[in-house]
A protein has these predicted regions:
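ATP/nucleoside-binding phosphotransfer catalytic cores, i.e., glycine-rich phosphate-binding loops
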Residues: 15, 177-179, 184, 209, ...
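Glycine-rich beta-strand-to-loop/alpha-helix junction loops that act as flexible
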Residues: 8, 62-64, 87
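ATP/NTP phosphate-donor binding region
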Residues: 1-59, 69
């Protein structure tokens, strides 16, 4: 049996209509499905847990990166197969997984695909599937949250970028990778990447792979404020890792410390003083999309 988990506000309400189409497609395969609607923070995880305990062998998540993150966390080391149907604004995990942009095409491509085990990250015990980190991109997300009451999603994000560009300051961080020596650095951005993209397509970790058993740890040290606007086109193209602007290290564990630091966890913002990351290799069962 399939569980179809949907964030009803995702995609301006279009996600619910999409969930009905997905359920009809499952029925056409001769399979049963149950629809679970999320209603708030943490509800996707609770609904996923209930679905698996009810005997669902496949879980379809319709939503953005935040909902996908919650569902994936509950499916770590479970027998259920995870299907992702992009229904958010950024859809960065869907990019990393090379899913078609069309939601139904994305679902069909996974139905036709071969089983695959992908890695999952954890930060202080909380799961993420794509990217976590701190710095410039998090400052933009914080500003976006402030502006959402005035502007719709994408417009709020664009205005937040322009606002943060003019005032962003690097943060002081302590970093330890795979239990090695602790370094003290002024950082513009630090990303612990399982996937490749943040912010709706910025290729912050262009060489990251979801199933290689490693994080790509991307560190951009402090850069002059006048050069910060140049980071955006570099991130979009993935050039920052090619020209020496960023340091990239492959790792299985990372510890980052900074006083009163805000960390992005697949779009969810958390305030911590220490973030300890560990990779769970091959923890989530999926179907590799057949394109």
């Amino acid at each position: 049996m399939f569980a179809v988990i949907v964030n009803p506000v995702s995609g301006g309400g279009e996600a619910v209509r999409l969930a009905i189409r997905i359920s009809e497609r499952i029925a056409a395969m001769g399979q049963e499905s149950r629809l679970f609607e999320t209603s708030g923070d943490g509800d996707a995880a609770r609904q996923t847990r209930a679905a698996v305990e009810a005997g669902c062998e496949a879980v379809v998540c319709i939503g953005g990166d935040g909902t996908i993150c919650e569902v994936a966390g509950e499916l770590c080391h479970r027998d259920a197969t995870f299907y992702v149907v992009p229904g958010g604004t950024g859809n960065d995990f869907a990019r990393a997984f090379h899913l078609p942009k069309d939601p139904m095409a994305a679902f069909e491509s996974q139905l036709a695909g071969e089983p695959i085990q992908i890695d999952c990250g954890r930060m202080n015990g909380k799961s993420f599937l794509n990217v976590s980190g701190s710095g410039f991109d998090v400052a933009v997300l914080e500003k976006t949250e402030e502006l959402k009451a005035v502007y719709p999603g994408e417009k709020a994000y664009r205005k937040a970028v322009l606002s943060v560009l003019g005032r962003y300051k690097a943060f002081e961080a302590e970093l330890s990778i795979d239990g090695g020596e602790t370094t003290h650095e002024a950082c513009t951005i630090v990303e612990i990447a399982n996937g490749q993209c943040i912010g709706g397509g910025m290729r912050v970790a262009p060489d990251a792979k979801l199933d290689d058993g490693y994080f790509d740890v991307v560190v951009v040290k402090k850069v002059p404020r006048l050069l910060i606007p140049l980071l955006l086109p570099m991130f979009m193209m993935g050039w920052h890792t090619k020209i020496g602007l960023a340091r990239v290290t492959r790792a299985k564990t990372v510890t980052m410390r900074a006083k009163n630091m805000t960390v992005n966890l697949d779009g969810k913002l958390l305030r911590v003083d220490e973030a300890h990351y560990e990779l769970l290799p091959g923890a989530v069962r999926m179907k590799k999309p057949r394109l």
